[in-house]
Structures are given as structure tokens and as C-alpha cells.
């Protein structure tokens, strides 16, 4: 049985949590298989800034954002499911932006094959592993995570958990979040990417034309 992170792990500042989730593995049990993906990209959100759902106020749909750290907040984005974890402070959370398929003794090649069946490309063909979870809705589809099943719930170590498997990014890229409308605090550098997996995330922050110090920063471990 995988060893789940405890709820208190999530009861931290959203930016701290967003960085510390990089390298952790999400596992979702579907049938007899533990589908798994290593988190490579996260975004922090605060109630006090305009880019967050919580800044629009409390509603029943958004209640998970206002619960203590370690609650699951899921919503629909562009027709797909998105996964967030509440952090310390009402309205603060971390969006799991992208991940990379993870295989080990618990989550084997059969689990990866099931993830590929869950998330074919637009033509119905099998996606290569490196593109399988390269976006917030893609990772939920690959892992079989659905809004009705998990929104406002706690983790269940028998079915859904986050595990520390000993993988720590050597460097983290800090940059601006994606898809934030103009005038909604789009300038805030609340997006964090495992530098070793930058080319597999939603949008590579190291792509041509991006300038270090202007568009992104490198954070070494301990920063």
C-alpha cells in the first residue's frame, strides 16, 4: 500500500506547498490498478489576489477552497476536469498544472497502459507517455479523476493519495501563471516547474524568447 502524505503537509502557504509538491506522486486506484503521475508543474492561488476563484467569493461550488489544507477542489476547465489542493488560509490553493507518468512496483506498466487508454489523442491514437499528463485536464483524464467523485473531499489512502517517493527537483523554475486574464494579477510569479521536466509541462517556460530574470527565475533547492 502506498504511503500517503498526511493532511498537515498541505496546511502551508500556497507558494511553499506548490514548490514542495513538485516531485511528489499522485496515485489513484482504478479497479486493481494504481494509476500514477509525478507532479512537474503547479500554480499557487490566494484569496487576496484577482487570479483566484476564491477572490470571486464563497459559493457552495468553491467551498473546498475555504476548508483547511488538504481538501480537494475540482472544477471544469475547457470541458475537462482540473485538480487542486487547498492550502493554509481560507481561499488559498494549489492547482496541479501538469505531471509525468510514474511507474514503479506499485504502479506498473499495466497502470501506464490504462492511463493511455483513458486519454487518447484527438484522433483516438495512443498518446506517448511524455504528453499524457502535459496539462491540467490531460492529467485528470489520464488518472481517471472526475469532479463529481472528488470535489470537496479529503484524500482516501485506499483510493486517492499523494506520496513522497524521494524525488526532489534539482532546480525549480518560477514564472507567471497561464491563462490569467489581463488585469487579474497575471504578472504574479506563482507558477512553479520542475526544471528537469520543463519541456513536458503545459508550456515550456524555457522556450525561445523567454529571458531569465524577466520572464522566469531559477530557484535552487533551499531557496
Swiss-Prot record:
One of its GO terms (molecular function) is DNA binding. Belongs to the DNA glycosylase MPG family. It is an enzyme of class 3 (hydrolase). InterPro entries: Formyl_transferase-like_C_sf, MPG, MPG_sf. CDD domains: AAG. NCBIfam families: PRK00802.1-5. The keyword DNA damage applies. GO terms for biological process: base-excision repair. This is Putative 3-methyladenine DNA glycosylase. The keyword DNA repair applies. Keywords: DNA damage, DNA repair, Hydrolase. The lineage of its organism: Bacteria, Pseudomonadati, Pseudomonadota, Gammaproteobacteria, Pseudomonadales. PANTHER family: DNA-3-METHYLADENINE GLYCOSYLASE. Its EC number is 3.2.2.-.
Amino acid at each position: 500500500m502506498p504511503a500517503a502524505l498526511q493532511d498537515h503537509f498541505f496546511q502551508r502557504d500556497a507558494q511553499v506547498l506548490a514548490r514542495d509538491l513538485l516531485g511528489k506522486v499522485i496515485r489513484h486506484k482504478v479497479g486493481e490498478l494504481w494509476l500514477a503521475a509525478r507532479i512537474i508543474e503547479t500554480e499557487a492561488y490566494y484569496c487576496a489576489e484577482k487570479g483566484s476563484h476564491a477572490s470571486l467569493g464563497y459559493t457552495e461550488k468553491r467551498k473546498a477552497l475555504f476548508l483547511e489544507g488538504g481538501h480537494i477542489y475540482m472544477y471544469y476547465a475547457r470541458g475537462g476536469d482540473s485538480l487542486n489542493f487547498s492550502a493554509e488560509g481560507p481561499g488559498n490553493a494549489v492547482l496541479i498544472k501538469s505531471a509525468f507518468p510514474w511507474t514503479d512496483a506499485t504502479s506498473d506498466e499495466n497502470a501506464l497502459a490504462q492511463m493511455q487508454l483513458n486519454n487518447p489523442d484527438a484522433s483516438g491514437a495512443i498518446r506517448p507517455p511524455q504528453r499524457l499528463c502535459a496539462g491540467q485536464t490531460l492529467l485528470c483524464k489520464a488518472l481517471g479523476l472526475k469532479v463529481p467523485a472528488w470535489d470537496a473531499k479529503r484524500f482516501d489512502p485506499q483510493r486517492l493519495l499523494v506520496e513522497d517517493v524521494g524525488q526532489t527537483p534539482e532546480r525549480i523554475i518560477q514564472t507567471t501563471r497561464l491563462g490569467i486574464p489581463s488585469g487579474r494579477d497575471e504578472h504574479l510569479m506563482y507558477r512553479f516547474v520542475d526544471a528537469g521536466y520543463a519541456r513536458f509541462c503545459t508550456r515550456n517556460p524555457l522556450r525561445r524568447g523567454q529571458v531569465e530574470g524577466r520572464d522566469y527565475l531559477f530557484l535552487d533547492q533551499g531557496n
